[in-house]
Design a protein with these regions (language model features):
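Cytosolic regulatory modules rich in charged/polar residues
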Residues: 28, 98, 102-115, 168-169, ...
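Alpha-helical transmembrane segments and immediately membrane-proximal extracytoplasmic
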Residues: 49, 66-81, 95, 109-126, ...
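Generic detector of multi-pass transmembrane helix bundles and their immediately adjacent loops
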Residues: 186-257
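Hydrophobic alpha-helical transmembrane segments
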Residues: 64-75, 85-93, 115-122, 141-150, ...
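Cytoplasmic-side transmembrane-helix entry/capping segments in multi-pass membrane proteins
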Residues: 145-148, 166-177, 200, 227-232
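Soluble N-terminal domains of membrane-associated systems
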Residues: 1-97
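Alpha-helical membrane-inserting segments
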Residues: 131-136, 152-161, 177, 181-189, ...
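Internal active-site segments that recognize and position negatively charged phosphoryl groups
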Residues: 108-167
Length: 257
């Protein structure tokens, strides 16, 4: 019976850490949360090493060999509701108010919390693009142009994600579509500032979370995970820039820009 509870507790801790990483949790916080949960569940000699896309953990139960587990976390998206739910679960365990069975049920609930609807994501991109265009020197006339560019980017991202296309190619195409749209509108309505509209629309694609977490990981002494996140942010930024450049090149070739 002790072996069964030990295995379930260890799997629970690994699932919690994976949930944090999959939904935008910090590497340092994921590792700390796993250690707290393991101690609360009575998992002794627990050692864990967390990377941006992987978890390595081991534990030992007296009377049996050490157990090692590895989890691969290939993709990372942001769902702070799930992160908060796991953090709350960790606090409940530390306070001794939950057992393994109750914690498993709570974790399953946390992992299935619904994401934002596609319509809400599109609305956020539209409003965000228009707002950023105004903040970066645009006028009220530039805001609708940026809003439509943000709409195009959101549609591209959603469709490509649905078909499993990688983030780099997705951002190239999304930035290209937004750029072409803004330049085309400026060609018809010269009063429109295409630069402001493009910059505003691109802001919804920028890898702000990856950049911030990369810096935080490095400051926490986790140089490997921090470097991985910063490289990810750099690749995304480069793909966005590449999409804009392709848009301008095509527009110049057509004599529009």
């Amino acid at each position: 019976m002790a072996d069964v509870l030990f295995d379930r507790a260890l799997e629970l801790v690994m699932d919690a850490g994976q949930t944090l990483l999959e939904n935008g949790g910090e590497v340092f916080r994921a590792q700390q949360t796993m250690e707290i949960m393991a101690a609360s569940l009575g998992v002794r000699d627990f050692h864990v090493y967390v990377l941006t896309n992987g978890i390595f953990a081991s534990a030992h139960l007296p009377g049996r060999d050490a157990v090692s587990l590895v989890r691969h976390v290939p993709t990372v998206s942001v769902h702070l509701g799930r992160v908060e739910a796991v953090n709350e679960l960790s606090r409940e365990l530390a306070a001794g108010r939950l057992g393994v069975v109750e914690a498993e049920a709570r974790l399953n609930t946390a992992r299935t919390l619904p994401r934002s609807t596609p319509q809400l994501e599109i609305l956020a991109c539209v409003v965000g693009s228009a707002g950023f265009a105004y903040l970066f020197g645009g006028t009220l006339a530039d805001m609708p142009v940026a809003a439509v560019a943000g709409l195009l980017e959101a549609l591209v991202c959603q469709q490509f994600a649905r078909h499993g296309i990688n983030r780099i190619f997705t951002d190239i195409v999304a930035a290209f579509c937004g750029t072409i749209w803004a330049i085309a509108v400026q060609a018809v309505v010269p009063a429109v500032n295409a630069n402001a509209a493009i910059i505003g629309a691109l802001m919804v694609l920028t890898p702000g979370v990856a950049l911030t977490m990369g810096v935080r990981d490095i400051l926490n002494g986790d140089y490997l995970s921090g470097s991985i996140r910063l490289l990810d942010a750099l690749l995304i930024a480069g793909s966005i820039a590449g999409g804009v450049v392709l848009g301008w090149i095509m527009a110049r070739g057509l004599g529009v820009a």
